Amino acid sequence: MVQRADMDSSQHTEPSTDTEEGEFMACSPVSLDESDPDWCKTATGHIKRPMNAFMVWSKIERRKIMEQSPDMHNAEISKRLGKRWKMLNDSEKIPFIREAERLRLKHMADYPDYKYRPRKKPKVDPSASSKPPALTQSPEKSPKSRSAGRKCPKLKPSHSGSGSKSLSIKSEYSGGSDEYVFGSPKASGKAAAAAVKCVFMDEDEEEEEEEEDDEEEEDELQIRIKQEEDDEPLRQYNVAKVPASPTLSSSSAESVEGASMYEDIRNGTRLYYNFKNITKQSTIPQATITLAPRPAPTTTSPAASHELLFDLSLNFTQQNPQLPDPNSGNVSLSLVDKDLDSCSEGSLGSHFDFPDYCTPELSEMIAGDWLEANFSDLVFTY
């Protein structure tokens, strides 16, 4: 009985020692065929990484689980092994940590030039794999080339020489890249070409450029308005070179010969009054030409001014041009202080609107026969 009990106890202890030895044999290099120089290489020649403590332990436990439940999925086995490894104490992990260190040193001795380089898995596009290779997307039309061929928001030339404002833009498409060729048609001096750099900017930068362009347009508009305002008085005076009324300057000694043109712009039509042969005439100092008091009309038309001139011509015919006058002077037509804007802008006023009263200046101006009493000399051009 004693022998049989000893035999039974020895039989019970042997499996335990076998399992422990088997575990260490599984994690030892002998199980990996240490004699083989390619013990840590794959069939393709890739050198595997040295196992750490968890890999040594999980390799042993994975074999046990696969023997007990061969139908269990590999992902489920890994999940259970991870939970169990976290529940182990540090004392239970020590033998596996030592075995992993020994394997690491052996790995360094066998493969001194080894460097960890993780494999780069090629990204497989399912849509591209389904299509035949002849119909695959060309590199010229790939999304990358589209993003690269994105339009530039603003193209600013570097001003050189005269700083030409116009640029001839030519886009040449070659090999999936857009090349912009800019040439300045107006080159000053040595015909320096404007070098333009295309910069891909964000939306914020595009908004800033648009604001800058708006400011530049406003500045150009203000400069244009200012130039028009500067040119406007000159245009007015050039178009409407019209005196308010003819004046008599008795101080000048020379006679004025020629024609004076009256210009009046009303509703797009021009009215010309040409007085010819205004020469030095002998007049009677006592004789004066008086105008019948007429109410000044608020609105004058060419017909009203024609009637007024006709009255003046009738009064001029009543004078005697043959009597000598030593105090007669020259007739000159000059500008007076009158706002010419009313004439050029088509206002309702006229140069021939006289007030109801006759001032001394007016009586002196129209004194004497300073126009010949011939209707042929009064040319009215409408």
From Swiss-Prot:
It is found in: Nucleus. Induction: By chrd. GO terms for biological process: brain development; camera-type eye morphogenesis; negative regulation of transcription by RNA polymerase II; nervous system development; neuron differentiation; positive regulation of transcription by RNA polymerase II. Expressed in unfertilized eggs but not in early embryos up to stage 13. Localized to the nervous system at the end of neurulation, and restricted to the central nervous system, eye and head neural crest cells by the early tadpole stages. In adults, expressed throughout the ovary, and also in the testis, kidney, brain and small intestine. Signal peptide: none annotated. Residues 158-170 have a biased composition (Low complexity). SUPFAM superfamilies: HMG-box (SSF47095). Residues 147-157 have a biased composition (Basic residues). One of its GO terms (molecular function) is DNA-binding transcription activator activity, RNA polymerase II-specific. Keywords: Activator, Developmental protein, Differentiation, DNA-binding, Neurogenesis, Nucleus, Transcription, Transcription regulation. Residues 1-11 have a biased composition (Basic and acidic residues). PANTHER family: SOX TRANSCRIPTION FACTOR, TRANSCRIPTION FACTOR SOX-11. This is Transcription factor Sox-11-A. It comes from Xenopus laevis (African clawed frog). The lineage of its organism: Eukaryota, Metazoa, Chordata, Craniata, Vertebrata. The gene is sox11-a.
